[in-house]
């Protein structure tokens, strides 16, 4: 990679199934894992603006990876002019076509806020799961976010817009947003249904059978979860129309996927409000292990696992469970401040990078 975060230039060849990146905070450990995540999913869980990923005063950042099957993936982030994706040297018409060859699942200390944090964190987590299963979902999310921004801009223009013209534009927005919203809702619901039985099993294992997990999808529109797609679309369109007075007063759309919630319950009670810190950590760990298992089942091969400073946030028992579950099947990139959390077997089959290897501007490999 070149010009990415604090790395002027870094070249690294992975020689073992596991890469342990060891050192204090601030040397670029998380940045390395973030670069892999970007190549695999086109998304970063740490920021939403590409300009924050490009090294200070650099015109661009370049990420390139070679896979075992010979595939060459490349993503260029430009300070002026957006992104460009290439596969095997060929420029892709759509960034989306870069998704698939490098499936990866990330688990970071930030994910531990999944249970007790705001609903947006759970939506983002569920969206990452859906993207693993259906890469075209990225296009739906992009379309919806553009429509939502354009709708907000229309309201901000306020008095500058003729009321009749504004209502006609809102009618058009309602039709488009209802269609895209329905497709997002259905995919989120489908992914959660696939994930739930696996997550329930992991939660039972992690709690020695004492806790029963329930995952509930609560759409940001008043919908019957069992309805077919067309009734959903019509219901959302009607709700968008009815909420316009409140939308005008508050300045934000009150209906749609951006208001969805995923309810996580243990023993029938909300884990966010009543779960202990240990229960919440076990729940997040179980969800991540379920995600890993589901992707492996569906595609017949294990995804790359990115563990970013998460071991320090888990007690020794949960650390052991996570590392044991990963086993020998998954290629792992792990960042940590110390080697002490890794047993001898893990170290023996790992490539280890220490602070000097990741100093800003150093080229290795």
Curated annotation (Swiss-Prot):
Keywords noted in UniProt: ATP-binding, Cytoplasm, DNA damage, DNA repair, DNA replication, DNA-binding, Nucleotide-binding, SOS response
Similarity comment: family membership: Belongs to the RecF family.
Function: The RecF protein is involved in DNA metabolism; it is required for DNA replication and normal SOS inducibility. RecF binds preferentially to single-stranded, linear DNA. It also seems to bind ATP.
Protein name: DNA replication and repair protein RecF
Annotated residues for binding of ATP: 23-30
GO molecular function: ATP binding; single-stranded DNA binding
SUPFAM superfamilies xrefs: P-loop containing nucleoside triphosphate hydrolases
HAMAP family recorded: RecF (MF_00365)
Gene name in the database record: recF
Pfam family, one: SMC_N
Gene3D superfamilies: P-loop containing nucleotide triphosphate hydrolases, RecF/RecN/SMC, N-terminal domain
One GO cellular component term noted in the UniProt record for this chain: cytoplasm
Record organism: Parasynechococcus marenigrum (strain WH8102)
Matching InterPro entries: DNA-binding_RecF, DNA-binding_RecF_CS, P-loop_NTPase, RecF/RecN/SMC_N, RecF_2
Annotated compartments: Cytoplasm
